[in-house]
Amino acid sequence: MAKKITATNPRLVKLIEILKQESYKNQAKIWKDIARRLAKPRRRRAEVNLSKINRYTKEGDVVLVPGKVLGAGKLEHKVVVAAFAFSETAKKLIKEAGGEAITIEELIKRNPKGSNVKIMA
């Protein structure tokens, strides 16, 4: 029988629990999907470069990355990016483009239903 491995990062465990609760409370399946993606092992979690965010978004979009945002590439327009983690370079480049780098918890507070959010993985 395979041993079930759970996340040991207390911030991640708490975030997954919050996402499941918000999904149930707000009837928003997006949060349950993000919780499932974050529960994966680190090597299978999303790592998205800024160049991909730039390519698939337009001015004013809200993007959610269930993993880490990396600083490769450049961002040419304002976007709000929510992720579990950011590299220092990515944070700097997002702010220089006039956008925002926020946590997933903050996105849940701003948009409990999860509407008009693009998931990038």
UniProtKB/Swiss-Prot annotation:
Entry's Gene Ontology cellular component terms: cytosolic large ribosomal subunit
Alphabetical keyword list: Ribonucleoprotein, Ribosomal protein
A GO molecular-function descriptor: RNA binding
GO biological process annotation, one example: translation
Domain of life: Archaea
InterPro entries: Ribosomal_eL18, Ribosomal_eL18/eL18-A/B/_CS, Ribosomal_eL18_arc, Ribosomal_uL15/eL18, Ribosomal_uL15/eL18_sf, Ribosomal_uL15_CS
Annotated PANTHER family: 60S RIBOSOMAL PROTEIN L18, LARGE RIBOSOMAL SUBUNIT PROTEIN EL18
Similarity comment: family membership: Belongs to the eukaryotic ribosomal protein eL18 family.
Protein name: Large ribosomal subunit protein eL18
The gene coding this protein: rpl18e
